[in-house]
């Protein structure tokens, strides 16, 4: 039996809207901001490939709510093996609910029913903004419960547009700057050409390099990066 963890209440981390590169997704960001201050559309479905920024965006909005003394919860459904559907109870009392990686629980009858019920409770309460992310569009998910399938299309649906290589370099350099070190164009370009191009992989590498450079008191030269990442 899997160990059941308590409700995964979100704590503030370093994901912000300022370090989310939103130039490719301005319509989505504008609509989210408008609804966070004046709730007219409570449901948003955001989909895209791995590393496209879905998790960052959901956590950033959660952070913004919490920093402004508003109630918010982020639920990583990719870790649903560690908690039960009870985590969704009473979430209609929150101002913001973020369900990340919906595809992780699709096909599970208990989870599909629990999310369907949450949709209905949020619609009835009229006080909650619900953000859902997945790796596919609603029509491409193999949802078993027809009523949930229809609920997923109730609100606004957006595909996160992927970043160009040039934009990825800017994102990495901004993240490095916020951590207190510099990432040259040459080194950043080396990273995106030698590693998988999804931002999740690139940020993991950046975190590793940050710790290694601090410990070794070294700048992030290409030879040093090669050594640390075994490239």
UniProtKB/Swiss-Prot annotation:
The record's section on Pfam families has: Bac_DnaA (PF00308), Hda_lid (PF22688)
**Can you supply a Gene Ontology BP term from the record?**
negative regulation of DNA-templated DNA replication initiation
Stretches of the chain forming a coiled coil according to its record: none
For this protein, the record's SUPFAM superfamilies field holds: P-loop containing nucleoside triphosphate hydrolases (SSF52540)
PANTHER family the record matches = CHROMOSOMAL REPLICATION INITIATOR PROTEIN DNAA, DNAA REGULATORY INACTIVATOR HDA
Task: Please give the NCBIfam families that the UniProt record associates with this protein.
Answer: DnaA_homol_Hda, PRK08084.1
Family from the record: Belongs to the DnaA family. HdA subfamily.
Name under which the protein is recorded: Uncharacterized protein HI_1225.1
